[in-house]
Amino acid sequence: MSTRGLGNRLATWFAALAAIALLLPLAGCLPTPRPASSTTPSATASKGPILVVASVNQWGTLAQEIGGDDVKVTTILNSTNVDAHDFEPKTSDIAEIQKAQVVVTNGAGYDSWASKSIAKSTVSVSAASTVGAISGDNPHLWFSKDARKAMATELADTFSKILPSKKKSFDKRLKTWQSEESDLEDAMAAFAKKHRNTTYAATEAVAYYLMSDMKLKDVTPQGYLQSVTSGGEAAPADLQEFQELLESDKAKLLVDNPQESSDSAALLKKTATANKVPVIEITEQMPSDQHTLTGWISSLVETMTKQVAAAQTDEKDSSNDTSDGTATDANTQDASPSPSSASQSASDPSSSTSPSSAQ
């Protein structure tokens, strides 16, 4: 699964759009990026509301925000207790997909059960197609700010073509959403500025894009990551390396996906807790107490901001306590050591403070 490769393609995609925008005044008509939707929306024009089916609630809530009262959204997968990768749709789910005017999917192999059920006359809007993701890339695209922005725009355009009389309404909702998303990006930028070079590790790469947008550094052992990405259990040596990472305070956060539980993940969470490393639970599907995609991710950013700040405060307090203890011990010694003893201390490595005690 290539996470960094897709990140580079996302940046390239948006750069290409900017370049096209600059060149349009100079050239009459230039080719546009590959559309994210299939079937011509105008061919299915209606008086509304538009019947929309989303494979997962992350994209379903976004479709509802952009569409408002002018769409009727049905979401197939709403529960955090179900793994979308292995989800088996019921006959009624397939029927919903096939009667929809617009089907919203994630793509990149995440919800192929929905993609392969779409009727030829149905307009398909895929997050993966929108940003150029392919099977094998990290499929958790809703955690990417670039993917969210691209999908919001694509949905507004698609709905406007099907229901042109409501285009102003769709555009207005899109602008409202963009304002909220901008606030989220500001919060992520503030975190990145205040907590530079903060590290994290993950039991599963569910939130890779989110952590990347927040400028956190992924220090998850590669051997472990490759094992879980391929669907296997981590080798004992890789698991031990991960535990040592947490025990040595090299990861300031541990991200866990409770929808992908395993004995290895349970052990790593236990190790993190024992070493006072904050554990952040991030599910794939939106929890039932969240109602919008941006709102959910904003709450995750807020939680991580508080957890990191609290951990840094504890670390600082611990460091101060250690320093105070060292000062007290020093005061019991001769306040004026002889030059010879000072020289001996400087040349003797064993007399210096260890990295662990200095932290």
Q: PLM ranges: what are they?
A:
Residues S2-A18, P25-Q359:
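Extracytoplasmic metal-acquisition and chelation regions
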